[in-house]
Amino acid sequence: VHDLNKLNSFLKKSQDTALHKKLFIVGGGPSGIELACKIKDIFTDQFEINVIEKSNEILNKNKIFNREQAEKALEKRKINVLLNSTVKEVSETKISISSEVGITSLDKDIVIWTAGVKPNLSYLETDQITKKFGRILVNNNFQIENHKNCFAIGDISVIEGMEDLPITAQVAMQEGNHLANNLELLIQGKDPLPFEFQDNGEMISLGIGEASISGLGVCLLYTSPSPRDSYG
């Protein structure tokens, strides 16, 4: 809440200034891309926006169509994208970025961190639970190895053989529903059913009145004719 209030205050103050401020968004996933486009549409000239992404492409776990539309949206808005880059240090006025060319120190006014999810497993410091990618490894029934009466779902877990599933609400909700049904089966003395993810598609907001939708065999770029709104 403190960080959100700080960001809100910074953006409101920036709306009333002609200064060209340098804003860095760390993370080229959905949150980072949506935020970059939205801020640029609201504050057209106040910011130089830079998106920092550690991999070689933005939205690397999202659908190709949405990624391509996002790249076009960023280019149209003159938002800089720094690929294969990571943040080494952030000070009051500088941000140090490590890339293929070395470490570069750049001036900054604000840094917004959207670089993904890392669960806190400090309370599970034990060799009896197998972990992968910093998450609890489970089978396709969500059972923890060697602990068949213990289950893990959502951001804290990774399903063996399904490591590429995105960390999204859609996946977590389906996991929750499936686990609830499996628990009922187990209570009845029946075998649990393996989880199968049903991809219902995804939508990425690309600024004011613009979005990319991909799924269920359909790819759409939506652009609203409505006027630009303002920051309130």
Enumerate the language-model features and the residues they cover.
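FAD-site-proximal beta/loop scaffold in flavoenzymes
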Residues: 1-19, 105-177, 181
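Cofactor-binding loop segments of dinucleotide-utilizing enzymes, especially the Rossmann-like FAD-
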Residues: 28, 54, 155, 208
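Single conserved hydrophobic/aromatic residue that forms the stacking wall/gate
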Residues: 222-232
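Internal hydrophobic alpha-helix adjacent to the cofactor/substrate pocket in enzyme cavities
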Residues: 171-197
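Residues at the starts of beta-strands that form the adenosine-phosphate
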Residues: 22, 46-50, 149
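A Rossmann-like FAD-binding core segment of flavoenzymes
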Residues: 43-140
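Glycine-rich dinucleotide-binding loop and its adjacent helix/turn
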Residues: 1-26, 30-45
